[in-house]
Amino acid sequence: MALVKTETQALGNHQHSSRFGSLYVGDLSPDVTEKDLIDKFSLNVPVVSVHLCRNSVTGKSMCYAYINFDSPFSASNAMTRLNHSDLKGKAMRIMWSQRDLAYRRRTRTGFANLYVKNLDSSITSSCLERMFCPFGSILSCKVVEENGQSKGFGFVQFDTEQSAVSARSALHGSMVYGKKLFVAKFINKDERAAMAGNQDSTNVYVKNLIETVTDDCLHTLFSQYGTVSSVVVMRDGMGRSRGFGFVNFCNPENAKKAMESLCGLQLGSKKLFVGKALKKDERREMLKQKFSDNFIAKPNMRWSNLYVKNLSESMNETRLREIFGCYGQIVSAKVMCHENGRSKGFGFVCFSNCEESKQAKRYLNGFLVDGKPIVVRVAERKEDRIKRLQQYFQAQPRQYTQAPSAPSPAQPVLSYVSSSYGCFQPFQVGTSYYYMGNQVPQMSGHQNITTYVPAGKVPLKERRSMHLVYKHPAYPVAKRGAKQTLVFKGEVNRNLEAATCSKATTSEENRKEERRLTLSGKLSPEVKVEESGKQLQ
């Protein structure tokens, strides 16, 4: 994609179109605010205003801004001093702002704009500008980056078409840091789409290249079929060949002749594949159609293609073939990789028949490779996988969320007593079952029953007090002297009357028991049965 175009000449060489100095500042970090820009630009020159463009809906920064100065001279000084300097980790791209709509429309067509590729990873936007500035006034210069790393190409826009032509003639094919520069006129998106739709394409795709093949080797091989305008072997972040490249001819007939002659040629240990270069979307659609046709023509193919995941980052196709090769003849093996050549952690292995793939799946599923257990499954088309998942979820019974009903109360029974302690530890008032956590929520309308527990330890034979409790193996035991409170979980409408009668009966029996023990001398007057003041709600 082209750079955002600037619209005026640099001050000193050309007259600025506005009486005020206005600069466009692009490639900003999303975290940059208006205050950051003011602090950065107002160190040596006065800033009149700053406008950071934001999304009208989300309010997020669009990563570019306009800064107005009191004069074009101040703006020129700021651009000279701060262009390509860092602000919150990203290099700013500064250029003159232009309000002339006609000029802006013309720059969108690629006016005086150059596309530069085969750049060394050490070349920055500032280095690229110094390389091209001897040929004229530069409006915009940028090396395209991803995650802070150069992608090996960039754009340079001059103020005149003549300057762009001079730079292209002088620098195209020159060696910079051991790489041959490719400099060409920038072609906008619409023109590229029209060229891609042309069946007589001049761009050729070459794969199955051995690691030692360079751009010069590829140029020598293909130039015997016609004039070659550009050659590139794609490489990862470490500079290693990714095994494929592109060759562009000046004549479509020469490109067609090269494809017919070189496809299948043995180059080193591999056979070349040479075909028409396609856009990523076109290639994906073609492979999708080819895969679907194979499934229709060869139903058994679906069982011979395996999906392998949980692969290490160092996994490559050669190792994948070595691992699966002992179980049969491998038709193809592919490890899906990022642009830097690192494995995405999954891949595909296709065998010549389904019996071989079944054997490989049986013995290699869960097999440790580089310390990781790999997962081997039968590969599915995306449509089949979506359909299978939909059928699975439709077959599951629907679960409706509703308020839980009150649990049926257990029947109250005589409480038994531990041999070590005098009573059970009851649940706290207003809580749910202690041993069930939050599984049984407290329901409104449930009754809280306070029971009567002796304050001290009494002989085992005298422990005959009645308590309304629920049997449960995890029911905790209280220490001696503890005050007991029991939550009776029951339905009000069904058990209110029974609970009231039980409480009255229990209270009366405890008073009689206290009186009898006191008179008989078995219970001291200080030890009393304590009744909570908590009444039935």
From Swiss-Prot:
Location of the protein in the cell: Cytoplasm; Nucleus
**Compositionally biased residues, Basic and acidic residues:** 506-517, 525-537
Hey, which family's this protein in?
Belongs to the polyadenylate-binding protein type-1 family.
Give the note: A.thaliana contains 8 PABP genes.
Q: Where is this region: Disordered?
A: 503-537
Tissue specificity is: Expressed at low levels in leaves and young seedlings.
Fetch the PANTHER family from UniProt. Answer: OS02G0815200 PROTEIN, RRM DOMAIN-CONTAINING PROTEIN
User: InterPro entries, per this entry?
Assistant: Euk_RNA-bind_prot, Nucleotide-bd_a/b_plait_sf, RBD_domain_sf, RRM_dom
- Superkingdom in the source lineage: Eukaryota
Q: What is this protein called?
A: Polyadenylate-binding protein 6
Task: Supply the gene name.
Answer: PAB6
Sorted alphabetically, the keyword list is: Cytoplasm, Nucleus, Repeat, RNA-binding, Translation regulation
Record function comment = Binds the poly(A) tail of mRNA. Appears to be an important mediator of the multiple roles of the poly(A) tail in mRNA biogenesis, stability and translation.
**Keyword Calcium on this protein?**
no
**Major localization listed first in the record, in broad terms:** cytoplasm
Q: Which GO terms describe its molecular function?
A: RNA binding
| Ranges for domain RRM | 21-99, 112-188, 202-279, 304-381
Kindly list the biological process annotations in GO that this record carries: mRNA metabolic process; regulation of translation; translational initiation
What is a single cellular component term in the Gene Ontology annotation? nucleus
